[in-house]
Amino acid sequence: MSKLTEKEFEKIDYVRTSTELGEFVAEKDTMYGHAFFNMVNEYGIDYALSKMEEKLFRLKQLKKLGKMNHSESFKDSVKDLQGYALLTLLYIQACEEAEEKKKTQVNYTK
């Protein structure tokens, strides 16, 4: 993989890449019936961490085997790792929002 200059790095379109990642993850999550959220609900946050570790291990293996240059598999694994990180963040945010909602609800049953 070639190295970038600082000027080349500054030209990266973060918004476009983030939007594409979000669309990719949303489509895949819907296609799999929200399996990630169901599994995290059942097995806890360790499930999310194990999925990210699995992808990180795959990336390390591809690098070790010298298969990271121009390898779709390497790029796909990076996208999957990002996707699991995004899903984990969304899960955490949803849990925080649910907790906050519980705190602010007024209990009318007396």
Labelled PLM ranges:
Residues 1-110:
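Intrinsically disordered, low-complexity regulatory regions
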